[in-house]
Amino acid sequence: MSAKTILSSVVLVVLVAASAAANIGFDESNPIRMVSDGLREVEESVSQILGQSRHVLSFARFTHRYGKKYQNVEEMKLRFSIFKENLDLIRSTNKKGLSYKLGVNQFADLTWQEFQRTKLGAAQNCSATLKGSHKVTEAALPETKDWREDGIVSPVKDQGGCGSCWTFSTTGALEAAYHQAFGKGISLSEQQLVDCAGAFNNYGCNGGLPSQAFEYIKSNGGLDTEKAYPYTGKDETCKFSAENVGVQVLNSVNITLGAEDELKHAVGLVRPVSIAFEVIHSFRLYKSGVYTDSHCGSTPMDVNHAVLAVGYGVEDGVPYWLIKNSWGADWGDKGYFKMEMGKNMCGIATCASYPVVA
């Protein structure tokens, strides 16, 4: 074994051990600041392989913050190269004075193609919403709304490396509806939807739609609790048990395709609504503010990610939707993001629906 190989192996062991230490926040604006002995070890170890630069120190802080583990030096160098590209995108975007900011997160060492494979579902044609069934009334809408303040929104979850966003959007809507109807919280099974809802044009880790998931649950007689049917993030055989049902769906209500006025009425006066939109490459690095981008599409065949609209408001003069994601609480603004309202931005009102529970 060469001296270089021995050094590389030792460095990787130190990197992994130090990364398992205290969870330290990442501040890409000041990558040189050393805040713990564990971080100092990571910085020194990574620098031995990649050299000395601000990018290298930023990368070291990133690996420490997110507990990244690489198989060998070659993979570390590859991930560093990708990280540099993403860091440059973050910095160049944030200099433009836009209504939102990007930031380093757990996806900063992934290519766009890798991210697509693990986080996004295949585009779904949500034709069920061409003619909506939501009834708009004359009731006055609140100027702002945040269903979290009513205590009915369940905690942010993490879909992991499975394109099952549609299941988390579905359970998020059902958990909120259940809490609203019965005055208590519940956690429902995403894995049952991954494994069992295929007959309703859903594809497990390859994507699906909340509207179709609601129809499956209605036909099936219910959805099991998370405790009874826990999430694995893999396509498996169906293990539904009627005795473990946590909620039943009486009906589902669709928002007319692209009708943000209907969506605002539903979110403002009824409850959180399952929605879908097109994620493009910059969005995965969202950190704060109101996201907007003219490059994303808004047709039924563009949308590739399902989420949950839990409110709306105005920030610095820009109206927005408040949305719960399923990429963990470390992503974005504690697992949430804001999307510009009024332009069907990225198709935010293209595939919207909500359930009626029992």
UniProtKB/Swiss-Prot annotation:
Region Interaction with VSR1: start-end pairs: 22-42
A UniProt-annotated Pfam family: Inhibitor_I29
Molecular function (Gene Ontology), one example: cysteine-type endopeptidase activity
Span of the signal peptide: 1-21
Catalytic activity line of the entry: Hydrolysis of proteins, acting as an aminopeptidase (notably, cleaving Arg-|-Xaa bonds) as well as an endopeptidase
Enzyme Commission code: 3.4.22.16
Keywords: Disulfide bond, Glycoprotein, Hydrolase, Protease, Signal, Thiol protease, Vacuole, Zymogen
Main location: other
Expression across tissues: Expressed in leaves (at protein level).
Prodomain residues: 22-140
Glycosylation sites (chain numbering): N125, N254
Induction statement: Induced during senescence. Strongly induced by ethylene and slightly by abscisic acid. Repressed by cytokinin and darkness. Seems to be not affected by dehydration.
Catalytic residues as annotated in Swiss-Prot or TrEMBL: C165, H305, N325
Broad EC category: hydrolase
Subcellular location(s) per record: Vacuole
GO BP, sorted A to Z: proteolysis
Residue pairs linked by disulfide bridges in the UniProt entry: C162-C205, C196-C238, C296-C346
Domain of life, per lineage: Eukaryota
GO CC, any one term: vacuole
Subunit structure: Interacts with VSR1/BP80B.
Known function: May play a role in proteolysis leading to mobilization of nitrogen during senescence and starvation.
Entry's family note: Belongs to the peptidase C1 family.
Descriptive protein name: Thiol protease aleurain
Lineage of the species this protein comes from: Eukaryota, Viridiplantae, Streptophyta, Embryophyta, Tracheophyta
Gene name for this UniProt entry: ALEU
